[in-house]
Curated annotation (Swiss-Prot):
Residues 72-88, 135-154 have a biased composition (Low complexity). This is cytokinesis protein 3. The gene is cyk3. Residues 72-189, 219-290, 358-393 are annotated as: Disordered. It comes from Schizosaccharomyces pombe (strain 972 / ATCC 24843). Gene3D superfamilies: 3.10.620.30, SH3 Domains. SMART domains: SH3, TGc.
Length: 886
């Protein structure tokens, strides 16, 4: 993108832009736009030269031209715009005004051979003006076609023969015989239209000279640097014939590389358009005219690419096989040039003109024979030249693919045995041991199953919470008993309501602090209330005194509060926390008002209210983070040993409220050897999405670069059965590190953020270590797809984020139905190359709510490769994953 030196200025469209909303300026590739204002820098304001419409447009879709311009109100500007307004869309590549590049390459389409001996263009123009006056016969179709195309100018070719000139159009329809036309009865509507066109022709001729028009200056400035001295020899007079309309329309689906010489069997006009076409346009498989009606830019696309290709890709760009990207088509025809042509979509009135002009002519001229399509050699196919991959690169690719492969059950068992023998460390399965416990302990000492009991989390306490939060805090010397009886208990008729009132008041009004008094003594409960802050031990004692004042049994439990960064085999276990135990419905429950406070540093929920999960917790849920000093205070039968309790992963309240459940978890997977990858699996409901990251800051020096300390993981969902949805997380150890922490965030679907961020609260934290050699590895980047909520996509391969040029990769993707009643038969997947080519993935097999797609693709371009899924609701391609090719 270039910045205009002065305003207004002329810019040329590099790509097609259909606009996103009202007020946008629509244009096609190659159009001229007069920039009136640069706006905010990214969106400019301009006027379309062809349509004379104004609007805003993206600045990276155009490039500035160093030519002077005129104001929209001038006569030159209006006449210039009107001179192109009546060009036929079907013949835009033929009827396009001839630019300086066309003159420099092919000065004559049809003419005598002595045309090359003319000294200058000025003398050529004067001679042409004297020898070829305008044809003004209304009864002749030749003059009408001439007026529709453009008025005569100094750029016209010398020795122009009228019949041969109009024999070279792209239209397959026959020329209108003037004699047959004169014998027929003229139509009044046709006569009126001819008069209008003739008047417009005369007006355009008087208003300005095309030799000094902005268009001519524009084309001279843009093509002089490339096409200055090369002038090919024109063919013999009358030897040029253009293809039929059907061939011309078919040619818009193909492209070729620009050529610098005239090929045998080609017309000079076609050769000039080949040379004037830009390489960036030739690299696309489809012409912009194919996808112009549906092309839009998706603003929330997180992954930028070198050229402005939309995140929402039109359907018409799709190729169903990879051969279209790598190999040329055996028979292709050249599409119309977009760099030097000014085309406008055909309207109803223009089509009516053409039908009336062709009326009365049923003959076809024998000289107009369709030209067979031109075959291009393989080296002219627009693809980026890449050398074959070296053996070292192939070995590196093989290692990355093997490293990211999913472990099987047998491999997990072998890994467990290897860790046990190599490191001489016991392997624990804490989740399995916890599930084998009978259950919670009742108040009378009898066990009860975990699933039995009142579910506190589904109860509504909004009325009690609102009443307690309306109480103005008293910063006076008041005892806990007076506060509970006179301020909190009134209006609370049940023991559950009274416990809830005490919990809300203390957790939201008492700020967490680790600082004790100067003499390391605990504050009294009265001091905690008056100061509004307290340590976990002081808060637990305050809860006990207030509940006992309300005749409710409560005791204090001291123990160790696990940190998200604690490794399971740590021996640094000190008493650092305290919480309370109560009885409810003849069942033991736990309350931690200090940890539920929004001011606690380990609080996962970043909100101003307390965390309700830590009100009346079950012992089997509390044991993950709260390790009591006395094993009897676990209130689980049988009691778990200290190593097993420490081996339990750190989980927050989000883990339980969202219904997550770890599986196949043991401590051996937290030890990585050489090039191994950490793999974690857990069950998750269908409306839950997860994000993971690896934090290596705790293992590095304080002066380490923070931007280089985070390596991201790969999180994907798949369905084992129509009812079991599994989230699989893979992570690697950052290079030059021996220890790190895997943090998993979870939340409800619908967050339109890149997966490489943490839009949800942390649900799990798993510290892990690495032994042996290590190698840097990045996974493929996944993006959320809110437009396709009924499909879960799982990338089987390649899961590495870096693709190497010259290597053939096999893309395997599985699509799962999120609901048994949802049909995913219409799922369409594709891969988009850095140059914008789209290759469809083939459906291999399907069944039981899953479809497997595959594609073998050789990486011949460097840049960003995108994985696309067709969103049926909006009819666009949406990006769900990206790779980087190097």
């Amino acid at each position: 993108m270039s910045i205009p030196k002065q305003l207004p200025c002329m810019v040329r469209a590099l790509y097609a832009w259909p606009g996103e909303r009202e007020g946008d300026l629509k244009f096609t590739e190659g159009d001229l736009i007069e920039c009136l204002s640069i706006g905010d820098g990214k969106w400019w304001i301009g006027r379309h030269i062809n349509t004379n419409t104004q609007g805003i447009f993206p600045s990276n879709f155009v490039h500035c031209l160093d030519i002077p311009t005129v104001r929209p109100g001038s006569s030159m500007s209006r006449t210039s715009a009107s001179s192109f307004r009546y060009s036929s869309p079907q013949k835009s590549s033929i009827d396009t005004p001839i630019t300086s590049s066309d003159q420099g390459l092919t000065p004559d389409l049809v003419g005598s051979s002595n045309a090359l001996n003319k000294p200058t263009r000025e003398s050529d123009s004067l001679k042409h003006q004297k020898s070829h006056p305008m044809l003004n016969s209304l009864g002749s179709s030749l003059s009408l076609k001439k007026s529709v195309s453009r008025p005569p100018s100094s750029m016209s070719r010398t020795n122009l023969d009228v019949s041969s000139r109009w024999d070279n159009t792209a239209d397959n329809d026959s020329q209108i015989d003037a004699q047959d036309l004169s014998r027929s009865t003229p139509s009044p509507l046709r006569s009126a239209m001819e008069n209008v066109l003739q008047s417009l022709n005369a007006m355009g001729k008087k208003s300005f000279s095309r030799a000094n028009s902005p268009l001519l200056r524009l084309t001279k400035s843009t093509t002089t640097s490339k096409e200055t001295d090369f002038i090919p020899v024109p063919p013999a007079h009358g030897s040029t014939s253009m293809t039929s309309r059907s061939k011309l329309d078919d040619s818009t689906d193909n492209s070729s590389k620009p050529r610098t010489s005239l090929q045998p069997g080609e017309s000079p006009m076609k050769s000039s358009r080949d040379i004037s076409r830009k390489p960036s346009m030739a690299s696309s498989v489809l012409s912009p005219s194919d996808y112009f009606p549906q092309h839009r830019r998706f603003q929330s696309a997180p992954a930028p690419i070198p050229r402005p290709v939309s995140t929402l890709i039109p359907l018409t760009q799709v190729r169903t096989t990879a051969s279209n990207v790598i190999k040329p088509r055996p028979q292709t025809t050249e599409r119309p040039s977009t760099a030097q042509s000014f085309r406008k979509g055909g309207g109803f009135l223009k089509k009516t003109f053409k039908k009336l002009l062709r009326r009365g002519s049923s003959k076809r001229k024998p000289s107009l024979q369709p030209t067979p399509p031109v075959s291009y050699p393989a080296h002219n196919v627009p693809q980026k030249g890449v050398r074959p991959a070296s053996p070292h690169t192939l070995k590196s690719v093989k290692d990355d693919l093997k490293r990211t492969k999913t472990y099987t059950k047998a491999e997990f068992a072998a890994k467990r045995e290897e860790i046990f023998n190599k490191l001489s460390m016991p392997v624990y399965e804490p989740l399995k041991d916890l599930s084998e416990c009978i259950g919670n302990v009742l108040a009378d000492g009898e066990p009860v199953q975990f699933s039995v009991g009142t579910n506190i989390h589904n109860m509504n306490f909004s009325a009690i919470d609102k009443q307690i939060r309306s109480i103005i805090p008293q910063r006076v010397q008041v005892s806990p008993a007076v506060l509970a009886k006179n301020y909190l208990a009134p209006g609370q008729t049940t023991a559950l309501a009274q416990m809830r009132a005490v919990f809300i008041y203390i957790s939201e009004r008492i700020t967490f602090t680790n600082q004790t008094l100067d003499n390391d003594e605990l504050r009294t409960s009265t001091q905690v209330i008056s100061e509004g802050q307290g340590t976990p031990f002081e808060v637990a004692l305050l809860v006990k005194e207030m509940l006992q004042a309300l005749d409710l049994w409560c005791e204090v439990i001291e123990g160790y509060l696990k940190s998200p960064d604690d490794i399971y085999y740590t021996r640094d276990i000190n008493i650092n926390h305290a919480w309370n135990v109560v009885t409810f419905d003849n069942e033991v429950r736990l309350i931690d008002a200090s940890f539920a406070s929004p001011t606690h540093p380990q609080q996962a929920l970043k909100s101003s209210s307390s965390n309700d999960f830590y009100f009346l917790m079950k012992p089997n849920e509390c044991i993950f983070t709260h390790v009591p000093e006395n094993p009897d205070q676990q209130f689980i039968m049988p009691d778990l040993s200290m190593p097993i309790v420490m081996a339990l992963p750190w989980v927050s309240s989000v883990y339980f409220t969202l219904g997550l459940k770890l599986r196949k978890f043991n401590t051996s997977i937290l030890h990585l050897n050489d090039l191994e990858v950490l793999q974690i699996e857990f069950l998750a409901p269908k409306d839950i999405e997860c994000v993971a990251e690896v934090d290596a800051l705790s293992a590095l020096a304080p002066t380490a670069d923070v931007s280089q300390c985070y390596k991201y993981t790969l999180t994907q969902a798949f369905w084992e059965t129509p009812d079991i949805r599994v989230m699989r997380v893979k992570a690697v150890m950052p290079a030059n590190n021996r220890a790190a922490v895997l943090r998993i965030y979870a939340g409800r679907l619908g967050v339109s953020s890149p997966v490489r961020t943490a839009p949800h609260p942390m649900a799990m934290s798993l510290p892990f270590v690495h032994h042996g050699k290590n190698k840097a590895l990045e996974f493929v980047t996944r993006h959320p797809v809110p437009h396709c909520p009924s499909v879960d996509l799982y990338i089987n391969s390649p899961q590495c984020g870096t693709l190497h040029s010259g290597v053939e990769y096999k893309f395997n993707v599985s699509a799962y139905a999120c609901q048994p009643s949802t049909s995913i038969s219409n799922t369409r997947l594709a891969i988009q190359t850095p140059t914008g080519n789209i290759v469809r993935l083939r459906e291999e097999r399907s069944g039981n709510g899953v479809i497997f797609f595959s594609l073998s693709l050789t990486i011949n371009e460097t840049g960003e490769y995108r994985a696309l899924i067709l969103a049926e609701k909006i009819g666009r391609w949406v990006v769900y994953a990206t790779w980087q090719a190097v």
